[in-house]
Amino acid sequence: MTFDVRKILEQLDTGTPAEAGVPGWQQQSWEDPDGFANALAVAHVGKGAPLKSRAGQHYDFFHDLVVRHANTDKIALRAYDKRAGWQVLGYKQLQEQASRRATEWTQQGVKAGAKVCLVYSVGNELLISLAAALCVGACVSFLPPTGRRFIAKRLAALGPDHIATEPHQLLLLEGFEKQVLQHKGKGSPAFTSHTYKPVEPLGLLFSPLVEPSGTPAPLVAEDAWRGALVDGLLTFGLGAGEHLAAPGYHPLQHVPALLFATLLRGATYLHLELSDVEVNPALITEHPVRALGVTPALRDVLLKARTPLKNVAHWFRNPEEPIDWHAWRTWVKECALAAVPSANVLVDPSAGGAVLTTPRRVRDLHVEAFPAPGRRWELHDINLSGQPAPGDLGIFTLVPPDKRPPGYLILTRSYGLYHYGGPRTARRVGRVYPAAEVAEAVQGLPFVRGATVVPAPTGGVAGHYRYVLLVFTGAQARQPGPWLQEIRKSIELQLGAEHLPDRVDFIPLYPRKVDGQLDEAWCQTEYMTGALFRKSADPLFQALTALRGHLLEKGGPNV
């Protein structure tokens, strides 16, 4: 098939579709992703330096993402620091520092194919180490420095050969100190970058979309490169030197995909912590933003401050976020975005980038979500039989399915359009909630006699749930205030604040146990039917609980 990339870009930039529904070129790209990638690669270079990568043959990420732009004054990363203000990392500086770090790493035994886990917050050090890992040819993994239990479980599952982090994060890496790489900045910058084969693993990523939680999912080089190519050029429409920003976007879901898309275009990733925007919403307006990712939390902050976003060329949202129609429409009106194009964009890190998108257009809020350009996909039976969906509703599945994590979201097709239909099972904004880890994190508290997490449907938009932590406290005198503080503190320290449950219910009963383990199915059924609530208020069950407490806890709560 022939793809006229110039016309495609004109359609996307003007927001004027040539036809209703999914554009014809996008449907053709699903059938011929190889031809589509080749056409994009030619158009992508434009007047810039040529790519070393060849679609379907080999991929030199370090050259195409970093070296190609190093002879310019372009900025790779612009990040805000609450103490020092805006900090920048240029492509030239990135190349030099990453090359030195790659040399240091090879002297410490890092080889092509080695599993290197990057434990960083988003910032200069992450970008330098990511580029160094690509230069060496490592298989990259990424973990933000959250809680100890969260990191320890994932490092144990990954079994990394090496870990790169900053010195002040070493306390989070107990048991893995021997794998930590040293950074002295004394390596030679002369280093020949690695070329990945198409099916060579470039990453093992802890995608929050993969079940069970904490399972590393492979990202092959071809998916990473094509994802960056399509997203940089089409999804976000980035040009050299333009900014992509996504404050508050989940790092495990969007790193490294957003970074790859930005760097391949020679653009600038604008990093802002949501907490900094809450303090000073005007920060988001200090630089022109080509593409702005907006979460409900960022929307509410900007709406409260009535911040006019005249510097934003277009914005996008994750279709898996709860959709408050009134709040979104009010935000668009109050922040001067009524004439600004928008899109829905869902990123899957193990697929290398966006898997569901819509063209950038000036229009009202919607739940449309088209399979991304250049992706082979199918609708599968929602019963997970593996057969194609018999109708126009099914599980969105990337092809070939046997080499990828199982699909989880429902896509519907109607009158030539595709709509997001929610996840097949309970999730939080499409992400797997680590319910077992949350329960384990509070199980050791002295007042806890049992804990489990129950997902409860919200009753609103399909597929949205609230997670309720049930804490059984037995016959103890109730102290909900202090208990809640201890629970929050324990979860934040061990797993990170993002994993706090939506609600905590203290149950003044003893849970049912089978072979010494909490019967989670019983707990969920009793809670959802209201039986636990009724028993808690029943004088008979209160007396039985007091008697059981007297008998069981003579030697301590675990007797």
Could you say what each language-model-derived stretch is?
Residues 63, 76-114, 119-127, 150-152, ...:
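Conserved AMP-binding/adenylate-forming core of the ANL superfamily
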Residues 136-139, 226-243, 251-290:
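Conserved AMP-binding/adenylation subdomain of ANL enzymes
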Residues 452, 492-559:
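Conserved C-terminal "lid"/linker of ANL adenylate-forming enzymes
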Residues 376-402, 413-415, 479-480, 484:
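Conserved beta-loop-beta connector loops within the AMP-binding
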Residues 143, 163, 285, 292, ...:
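AMP-binding/adenylate-forming catalytic core of the ANL superfamily
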